[in-house]
Amino acid sequence: MWPYPKVFAHRGGGILAPENTLAGVRCGLEYGFHAVEFDVMLSKDGVPVLMHDPEFGRTVKGQGSVAATLFSDLQAMDAGGWHSARFAGEAVPSYAAVVNFCRQNHIFMNVEIKPAPGFEEATGRIVAETTLALLADVSVTDEQHLPLFSSFSFAALMAAKHAAPAIPRGVLMDSVGDDWKARLQEAGARALHTNHRHLNDAQVAQIKDAGYGVFCYTVNDTERAHEILRWGVDAFCTDRIDLIPADF
């Protein structure tokens, strides 16, 4: 059901580094994390890049949106200065650059497909096609070296399924709705990814009994982490890579 690591560094390095950057992934690696979660969306010219927010202002200074900005211009923007002076000038990375870094350092990837509004199907398809090209030398049966896709956008996840059916998928839901099983079946999903705050032990048992894995976001308290693992949750991501170790 869940052949992957148990603890993932959220958006690269959690709170210790700017999210969705190579510096963040390096930070997670420095803390011993060989499993990372990050977000991917498309630039104006269709290049998959790491970014959570479709609009600038929080992690990238300025006005505008990722979907309206060329990749070359995104690379010139500061994606690290918001975090601390140490990371000022950190670039918005391409998905390809991060995949290559993760492969070189044996880091497992949970790739959250995060489409800007109106680009759901295109984002799912292009991220999947890009992944296939980057991992052309990896066997489709080699689960440890294939990423795990996930998305809140069912349209994006289905587009990824059609473009790259061999790459495993997880359905993201903020809470476990009545249609969770139908959604996972339609997506051909490996797991359900959900907010630990809206989850209970009975739901975990139901999902696991149906043959699916359970992944939670974003767990930053050790007592809560122990609790959900006792319930049978398979894995979770954390911002507190300084408190919750990779071998928790």
Give residue spans per PLM region.
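Phosphate-group recognition and catalysis centered on beta-loop-alpha active-site segments
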Residues: 1-248
